[in-house]
């Protein structure tokens, strides 16, 4: 004689929450499974985000001590005029360049760091 699903469900419905939690834990151990189901959509989104990251933004966080050198570096990198570059630098934290390759972003970060600026790549 076997027990039906309905009989199992009836027995579980009469149990306390703590007993159900213990039952689930015991079942996980017995069958070597986990009740936590990984969300495939979240995993897929994380993979797509990691693969799709081909464009980067360079964020000027702070100017540092040598504002003139930072302005010159920003002018050179962006092609802005003196006033526009000065205004951009003085508005830190701000994005200096958007949607550039990783190599270009790393190069710009290195140049700006050499002038004493604090830079982050996003």
From Swiss-Prot:
GO terms for molecular function: mRNA binding; structural constituent of ribosome. The keyword Phosphoprotein does not apply. Gene3D superfamilies: 3.30.1390.10, Single helix bin. Keywords: Ribonucleoprotein, Ribosomal protein. The keyword Ribosomal protein applies. One of its GO terms (cellular component) is cytosolic large ribosomal subunit. Pfam families: Ribosomal_L12, Ribosomal_L12_N. Homodimer. Part of the ribosomal stalk of the 50S ribosomal subunit. Forms a multimeric L10(L12)X complex, where L10 forms an elongated spine to which 2 to 4 L12 dimers bind in a sequential fashion. Binds GTP-bound translation factors. Belongs to the bacterial ribosomal protein bL12 family. Forms part of the ribosomal stalk which helps the ribosome interact with GTP-bound translation factors. Is thus essential for accurate translation. This is Large ribosomal subunit protein bL12. It comes from Buchnera aphidicola subsp. Baizongia pistaciae (strain Bp). The lineage of its organism: Bacteria, Pseudomonadati, Pseudomonadota, Gammaproteobacteria, Enterobacterales. The gene is rplL.
């Amino acid at each position: 004689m076997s027990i039906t699903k309905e009989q199992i469900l009836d027995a579980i419905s009469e149990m306390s929450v703590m007993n159900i939690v213990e039952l689930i834990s015991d079942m996980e151990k017995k069958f070597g499974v986990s009740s936590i189901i990984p969300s495939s959509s979240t995993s897929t989104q994380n993979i797509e985000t990691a693969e799709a990251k081909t464009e980067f933004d360079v964020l000027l966080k702070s100017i540092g001590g040598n504002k003139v050198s930072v302005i010159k570096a920003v002018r050179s990198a962006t092609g802005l005029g003196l006033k526009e570059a000065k205004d951009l630098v003085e508005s830190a934290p701000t994005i200096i360049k958007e949607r550039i390759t990783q190599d270009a972003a790393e190069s710009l970060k290195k140049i700006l760091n050499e002038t004493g600026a604090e830079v982050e790549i996003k």
